[in-house]
Amino acid sequence: MSQENTSSIIVVGKLGAPYGIKGWLKVHSFTDDPAGIFDFSPWLIGQQGKWQTLEVVDWRRHNKGFIAKFAQVNDRDEAVAYTHAEISMDSAQLPELPQGEFYWRDLIGMSVVTDKGYDLGIVDDLMETGSNDVLVVKANSKDAFGQAERLIPFLTDTVIIEVKHDAREITVDWDPGF
């Protein structure tokens, strides 16, 4: 894969420095279960807008992270070329989630409205805080409350009233002035 349609590609990790002389690389996983990154194959490795498919043939835990060996990488010199490359996969490989659960990528771009009908803006990003996820909502340019951005906790049944996936809308119980 070189520069095909990348709209369905999601980043799940990053390659680190080479490890040893046999072509192993350090792996930094961004998945909820860090070892879960190895459940997906093949990996799409991206650098400077170019993508290449690599097959993981072996992996191990190493210190607080992981190391991996690829079929296409045979020595340290070849491994150096992949240092700091993004590890991605096709979103079609993601498992289906139970009712009421969402991937962050599915929430980005949704409009956010209060239960009273006030348009708060569009989900621009999400943050993980430890206790709960937080929606980063970019407010409309003519927001009546002068807000540029709102941080809204993703707490189902208290703040998040409903997520209408097909309508691309999230209804919240939230004060627009906050």
Swiss-Prot record:
Q: Where in the cell is it found?
A: Cytoplasm
Signal peptide positions (record): none
This entry carries the following GO cellular component terms, namely: cytoplasm; ribosome
Q: What are the protein's GO molecular function terms?
A: ribosome binding
* Superkingdom of origin organism: Bacteria
Q: Primary place of residence?
A: cytoplasm
Q: Name one Pfam family in it.
A: PRC_RimM
Question: Can you cite a GO biological process for this protein?
Answer: rRNA processing
Matching entries from Gene3D superfamilies are given as:
PRC-barrel domain (2.30.30.240), RimM (2.40.30.60)
Q: What protein name applies here?
A: Ribosome maturation factor RimM
The root-end lineage is: Bacteria, Pseudomonadati, Pseudomonadota, Gammaproteobacteria, Alteromonadales
